[in-house]
């Protein structure tokens, strides 16, 4: 492939940060890790537990198929946020823990901060307003039903 595209300067690449978050492309080690189940990471649609009965992890997956938290897209209000270097806490309007934001950036196309967060079940309904604790102070974060692109 690279040889065929040499005249076009074809080379290995990946989406930029903005596109990755807008599209909901998860970053292993950042948005999900070995500690997260496929169901928490939004990959449950690829786990057919009815046909995978011989799978080594079948019993564990059966036990975890209704997660208490899950990856959700979040629209965060205000001007561009500073770079994220660690997860930022999410709270509900009463100040109770609601999850965390793992990836966030300003989207010039959508004119809002686009984010990926691990949100607790009680707070993941689209339209729910949460608060993300940024280095610049708390910001309103609305849970969305889908990613932007």
Predicted regions and their residues:
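Conserved, structured C-terminal
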Residues: 1-149
């Amino acid at each position: 492939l690279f040889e065929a595209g040499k005249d076009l300067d074809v080379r290995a690449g990946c989406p930029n940060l903005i596109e990755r978050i807008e599209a909901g492309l998860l970053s292993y080690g950042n948005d999900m890790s070995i500690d997260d189940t496929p169901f928490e990471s939004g990959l449950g649609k690829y786990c057919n537990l009815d046909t995978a009965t011989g799978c080594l992890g079948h019993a564990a997956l059966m036990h975890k198929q209704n997660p208490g938290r899950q990856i959700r897209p979040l629209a965060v209000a205000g001007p561009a946020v500073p770079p994220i270097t660690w997860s930022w806490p999410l709270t509900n309007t009463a100040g109770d823990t609601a999850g965390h934001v793992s990836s966030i950036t300003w989207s010039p196309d959508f004119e809002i901060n686009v984010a990926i967060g691990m949100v607790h079940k009680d707070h993941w309904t689209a339209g729910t307003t949460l608060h993300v604790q940024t280095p610049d102070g708390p910001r309103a974060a609305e849970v969305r039903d889908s990613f932007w692109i």
